[in-house]
């Protein structure tokens, strides 16, 4: 662990107790998309949900995700160049000012050499900067209203799955409202949220923006396991937060994150789509997850204070 990493960890660790690191899956965990598209979400309700309506909602999300990926996040150029996280090529980035850089005219191609790796690193830096600014600089008010409406329609159709998942993240984070109505995480927050998705990196970042998760998931905490596997991503996360006070818990619906968590002896919370399950949204709470932490790491004052 280098000095910079040690300093960053020092700002996250206090004398108040352990720091919980929540390692999330995305689809069918923090959001619903795949199960809308293939109908499995609606089918789990045994006829009380309109399957076709769910598919329509999922297709609308797909359309918006791909458009924003292509229009603002270079996805047409980098689709075949997926990396596990945005900083993976930082060593090739020379820090060039990108404010007037012509991304469409730099002859970027598959990064098999240092020059194209640098060009890809430029794109990753630009993506990170755009992600941190949110959608407002790129989307007009009419389009934003349409996205808000789609979010609300989806939340209603899914019985508040989206807003309940977001509320979970908010309860585990110190969130401050700014004068312009936006939210920001206080640096003193004792919990960390990390996303490890089996989807491609750029679309996953765009999903975070569209599903209002970017307040809680910074770009450096979003990983794509599609090429390297979830176990490797989990190992990187464990290495990043290499301090006795950090406690890890994986939350997802798939076998791969379960196996990866077991390999590292982390607690794992299995998300279940079934309507009568408590391990879904709404239903899952920080209090419930605190029992999983306690089972592996023992009780703490922080656990007993969860509501």
UniProtKB/Swiss-Prot annotation:
Start and end residues of each stretch annotated as Necessary for optimum phosphatase activity: 1-15
Record keywords, A-Z: Hydrolase, Magnesium, Metal-binding, Protein phosphatase
One Gene Ontology term of the molecular function aspect: protein tyrosine phosphatase activity, metal-dependent
Gene Ontology BP term (one): protein dephosphorylation
Result of changing residue 27 to A/N: Reduces phosphatase activity 30-fold
Reaction it catalyzes: O-phospho-L-tyrosyl-[protein] + H2O = L-tyrosyl-[protein] + phosphate
Cofactors named for this entry: Mg(2+)
Record-linked InterPro entries: EYA (IPR028472), EYA_dom (IPR006545), EYA_dom_sf (IPR038102), HAD-like_sf (IPR036412)
EC assignment: 3.1.3.48
pH dependency: Optimum pH is 5.5.
Keyword match Metal-binding: yes
Chain segments annotated as coiled-coil in the UniProt record: none
Effect of residue 252 to A: Reduces phosphatase activity 30-fold
Active site: 25, 27
Cofactor-binding details, from the entry: Possesses phosphatase activity in presence of Mn(2+), Co(2+), Ni(2+) or Zn(2+). No phosphatase activity in presence Ca(2+).
Activity modulation comment: Inhibited by EDTA.
Binding site for Mg(2+): 25, 27, 253
NCBIfam families: EYA-cons_domain
Family: Belongs to the HAD-like hydrolase superfamily. EYA family.
Function: Possesses phosphatase activity toward para-nitrophenyl phosphate (pNPP) in vitro. Possesses phosphatase activity toward several phosphotyrosine-containing peptides in vitro, with low peptide substrate specificity.
Annotated protein name in UniProt: Protein phosphatase EYA
Organism: Arabidopsis thaliana
Upper classification of the organism: Eukaryota, Viridiplantae, Streptophyta, Embryophyta, Tracheophyta
Gene this chain is encoded by: EYA
């Amino acid at each position: 662990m280098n000095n910079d990493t040690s300093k960053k960890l020092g700002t996250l660790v206090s004398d108040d107790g352990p720091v919980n690191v929540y390692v999330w899956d995305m689809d069918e965990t923090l959001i619903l998309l795949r199960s809308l598209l293939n109908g499995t979400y609606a089918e789990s309700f045994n006829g009380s949900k309109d399957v076709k309506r769910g598919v329509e909602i999922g297709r609308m999300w797909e359309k918006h995700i791909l458009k924003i990926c292509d229009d603002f996040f270079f996805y047409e150029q980098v689709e075949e160049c997926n990396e596990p996280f945005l900083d993976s090529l930082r060593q090739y980035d020379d820090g060039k000012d990108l404010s007037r850089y012509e991304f469409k005219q730099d002859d970027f191609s598959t990064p098999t050499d240092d020059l194209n790796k640098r060009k890809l690193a430029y794109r990753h830096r630009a993506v990170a900067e755009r992600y941190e600014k949110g959608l407002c600089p790129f989307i007009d008010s009419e389009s934003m209203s349409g996205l808000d409406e789609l979010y609300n329609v989806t939340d209603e159709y899914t019985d508040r799955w989206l807003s309940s998942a977001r509320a979970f993240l908010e309860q585990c984070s110190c969130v401050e409202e700014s004068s312009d109505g936006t939210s920001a995480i206080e640096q003193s927050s004792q919990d960390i949220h990390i996303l490890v998705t089996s989807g491609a990196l750029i679309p996953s970042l765009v999903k975070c923006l569209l599903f209002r998760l970017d307040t809680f998931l910074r770009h450096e905490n979003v990983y794509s396991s599609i090429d390297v596997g979830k176990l490797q991503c989990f190992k990187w996360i464990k290495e990043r937060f290499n301090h006795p006070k950090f406690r890890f818990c994986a939350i997802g619906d798939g076998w791969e994150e379960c196996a990866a968590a077991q390999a590292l002896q982390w607690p794992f919370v299995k998300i279940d789509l079934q309507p009568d399950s408590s391990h879904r949204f709404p239903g899952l709470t920080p209090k419930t997850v605190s029992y999983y932490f306690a089972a592996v790491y023992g009780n703490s004052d922080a656990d007993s204070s969860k509501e």
